[in-house]
């Protein structure tokens, strides 16, 4: 006999969990569509050569890579952005530019499994391809804010930085292995200051004084300063080199655009330590954390990548986008008790007291569905206790009972499973009026 078990870092979803996830994905999809983003799909499995060039050394260690039955070198996608680059290169002539897309799908990384972190997880990506305008960067942040608010999340912070600022800091301190240094800096939250110092010393051949001065600059944060105060405080850095100057100027322009969009200034702050470990980022980058739940990590991250298609096409296309980590958000929303705990999407359960009443019950159920109310018929004619127990377990809001009197008079008796209220022999229209009073629960 085989023991039923699930691999570490992977999980089954029971109906309640799957319903919760579907509801959240539906809400963010509506937000994406409201901004004009259109859906696309790409395969879970790609040629390894498609995925590997843009993966950091850490990500490469986590990629599920193997030979398929045709002896081809293939890998499971680790994000949705690299497949997007391949997709755009293949189809750009028919897509039209600029191109705004969203994609929702599972990705795979062999990282250490822990709370809120899985080896298979769902990403919700939205990207603006084919424009270098900072208006696009501002819109991506606007979509992040709208998406989190659609999920009833208000207490969060988007930490913003610019890769040119980090490149400029590395240039100022004479760091030659810039990508490696930034990959290590990106692990500041994960391995701490001492861990980063050790890795920089080992991997980038930097002396301790240089490392300490570099990390002191990398840890510059806006914190409670106003935007104007912060930009005044860091103005001197623009004289260090062109990278720092360009990065800070872009952030100043971005803040003007976000101000025009009237996004609350409490929701976004500059943090020079935000690096994003993926090597394809070239411009503004951001990570979003929930205040009071920092240990969960980033729930939405992204940035600008101005060499999106360089590995696949001579025609270079810029892009900017972000990815919502829906699985981490489910963990957070569950702890905050903001999730629907029902194990059904049907609002009404119809129970029959006799086999001959099923034809009437099915007609009632179909009429309810046509009125926009999800309904199901309990499949057995039994004592009322069993369907009531079933409804309590699943989370139906109402049970409609069809007994002899209801069958003869073509009415139904209705019980609200939340309040305990029971009304007998109602007409369909009256029952519909009562059931429909709480349509927001559908």
Swiss-Prot record:
The keyword Aminoacyl-tRNA synthetase applies. GO terms for cellular component: cytoplasm. It is an enzyme of class 6 (ligase). Its main location: cytoplasm. The keyword Protein biosynthesis applies. It is found in: Cytoplasm. One of its GO terms (biological process) is histidyl-tRNA aminoacylation. GO terms for molecular function: ATP binding; histidine-tRNA ligase activity. Its EC number is 6.1.1.21. Pfam families: HGTP_anticodon (PF03129), tRNA-synt_His (PF13393). It comes from the Bacteria. Keywords: Aminoacyl-tRNA synthetase, ATP-binding, Cytoplasm, Ligase, Nucleotide-binding, Protein biosynthesis. It catalyses: tRNA(His) + L-histidine + ATP = L-histidyl-tRNA(His) + AMP + diphosphate + H(+). InterPro entries: aa-tRNA-synth_II (IPR006195), aa-tRNA-synth_II/BPL/LPL (IPR045864), Anticodon-bd (IPR004154), Anticodon-bd_dom_sf (IPR036621), His-tRNA-ligase (IPR015807), HisRS-like_core (IPR041715), HisRS/HisZ (IPR004516), HisRS_anticodon (IPR033656). Belongs to the class-II aminoacyl-tRNA synthetase family. PANTHER family: HISTIDINE--TRNA LIGASE (PTHR11476:SF7), HISTIDYL-TRNA SYNTHETASE (PTHR11476). Homodimer. This is Histidine--tRNA ligase. It comes from Helicobacter pylori (strain Shi470). The gene is hisS.
